[in-house]
Each structure stands twice: as structure tokens, then as C-alpha cells.
Amino acid sequence: MQKIAIISYFHYESSLCLAKSIAEQGVTVDYFAIIDMFHDKGTVPGIDYHKAPKYPGLIRLTSVNAPEICGYYEGLPVNLFLFRLVSFSRRLTLLNKIVFKIVLNKIKSAKYDAINIVGQWPWVEIIHNELKDENLTHTFHEVGSHFKGELSTPLMETVIRDKSKVILPSKSTLDRFRTLDKNGYCLSEYIPFGKFETLMLYRKPTELKIQFNNDSPIFLFYGFIKPYKGLDLLKRVCEILNDRKVDFNLIVAGSGDDPTLPFYSTKKNCVVINRILYDDEMMYLNDISDVVLLPYKTASQSGIIPTSFIFGNPIIATKVGALVESIQDGKNGILVNAEDAVSFADAMQSLITDQNLMSLLKHGARQYGNGDE
């Protein structure tokens, strides 16, 4: 039986479902989740491991110390490990290098048929340099900064120099990477996100409670708040709907800063949660909402899409980057031109007034990941 390793530096929810898909094909998968001992809360998106031993190095997850995630793979050849660093801080580089050396030597000694490294943080270059003589594939969720237009990073340059294989989650990011790899040194391919199913293993009540004074649909904007995500466009959309006297509710949730946040805070039909969201809060917000909004100015891809679709929430989005690859206009969402506030307002209003359309798009959202998208 073939045996592969997946080493995930963040992006756990996307790589955990990949491990399941590969294991269902009869391939043994050893999954390594890189975590930080100093700032460890006992959970990352998709894995609750608070019962696991707390020391640096490799810790195997079992049905005793991580029953939910181990149950997710029941009957499948998947082995789960924590790859615990001392700290993600660069001030402890020496200690981390010792942990890396010990763990990566164990991984090399396992003689895997293939190794997939997920993530692009600077520490990944240490892993790459130790494992570059193995049958190595990198998965990058982003290439540079799509907002600043920066493509190259030291890690990207190293991967291209060493002619590694690379997986990208969207055609948009694949095109960006191939622009960077102008000589075609790397074998690069596009594999989309699967369902972020493991998030649903840990649903629990949350202290966060939101109530509106009407029964109008609830629209949700969530995730890290950054200028390219278009809250200024959404402000113009809200003003248009208010002028039309259309009733709706809006939640703006996530950490970050934007000059339009005071506008939303003053609106009676809007709730602003300007901080980092816990997983249970993110799931609660999706539970109580009807539609998710992505008024982005630019985008490569977004984990918001598969997360929202799990809850059956259709998405209204602008036609930028990879958003058009997963959101199908009239099937699981509505797509409008970038910076077109009137069309975005029209899309929101259509879902407020047309329950048949709302039901159709919710059904389409739930079908995401079933092979028909």
C-alpha cells in the first residue's frame, strides 16, 4: 500500500478533507498538524486536541485524546500527529530548529512515497530544505499579495529554484504562480478546496448572541477585514437599499480596520463584531444568517466560500479572481461586476423579495463539493 505524508502549517480545515479523500482511495496517510506550544489553545480549525500531551515534537492523536477527528477517519488508513514547535516566534529559532531536525528526520526515515507540505509561512522553508530530496509537493493557498501585486517571496523562489511540484487551490492562483515560474521549472496544477467538513465536528453553544428587531433576511460579511475586501462598496450598497426603503439586516464580523466601520456601527439594522472570531462564533454567525457577502475588489481564492456553503448560505460576490470558479451565478450565488454598487444592491434585493430564488440558491450551496460544481 502506498503511504504519503501531509504536513500542514495552518490551513488545517482544507488539508484534513484532502487526507480523507486520499485515504478513501486506499492510500495510507500520515497527517502532521504544525502547532505552537507557547500559544497553544488546544484547538485549531478542524481539530480539538486539548487532551493531547503538551510537549514539543511529535504527538500522536488517538480516539482518547482527540475522539472527534479520529472518528472522522474511522475505518480509513489515516494516522494523525501534532507537530508541535516551541513557538512560532522567530526569537526561538534555535529551539525550533532542534525540533524540526528531530521530527523531520523521523519523517524522512518513514520512506513515504510522497510528501505534501501545506502552507507558505517562512518556517516552511526549513521543512522544504530538509525534505527537498524526497518526492515533495507544496500546496500554496496564496501567491504573494494579490492586493499589492507582489508575487515573489523567498520561499517561492526556493521552491522554483529546486523545481518542486506545486498545487494551487484555484485557476487564478495557478496562473499567478506560473507567471512567477516563467521558465516552467515546476510541475504545477490546480486542485480546488473540498468540503471543510471537520469544522462541523465541534459545534457547540456560543456566548455570542445577536438579535434583530425584524424578520428580514440577515446578510453576513465575515473574515479578516482588509481594504481589498470592499467594505466601502458595501457601504454604498447599504445606502442604495436604504434609499429604496428595503428592509434587511447585516452583520460585519472580523478583526482588522476599515474607515467605513463607524458607518456600520451607527446603523440599527447592522451589528459589527470587530475582533478575531472563534470557530464556534463563525459557525453561529453562519447558522443565523441567510446570505454571505463578498464585495471584494480583488481575490485569489477564499476559504469563506466552502465554509459558508456547508451551512447552505449562498454568496453574493463580485467577479474578481477565483471567486467566479466556485460561485456559480444563479446556482449557489449571484455574481456582479466589481465596484458595481447598484448591481450588488439589486442582487441583495432579489433575495430579499424572491423566496423561490433564495431556496434555489441555498440548495445549490449545499451541493458544493459533491462533484457538480
Q: Where do the PLM segments sit?
A:
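An aromatic- and histidine-rich active-site surface loop
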Residues: 12-16, 92-104, 115-133
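Donor nucleotide-sugar binding/catalytic pocket of nucleotide-sugar-dependent glycosyltransferases
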Residues: 161-202
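Short hydrophobic beta-strand element within catalytic cores of glycosyltransferases
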Residues: 291-294, 314-317, 327
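Nucleotide-activated donor-binding/catalytic signature segment of Leloir-type glycosyltransferases, i.e.
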Residues: 260-284
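A short, well-ordered alpha-helix in the C-terminal region of glycosyltransferases
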Residues: 343, 350, 357-372
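Aromatic "clamp/platform" in nucleotide-sugar-dependent glycosyltransferases that forms part
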Residues: 296-298
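Short acidic/histidine- and often glycine-rich active-site loop of Leloir-type glycosyltransferases
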Residues: 306-307, 320-330, 334-335
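Conserved donor-binding/catalytic core segment of Leloir-type glycosyltransferases
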Residues: 212-229, 235-238
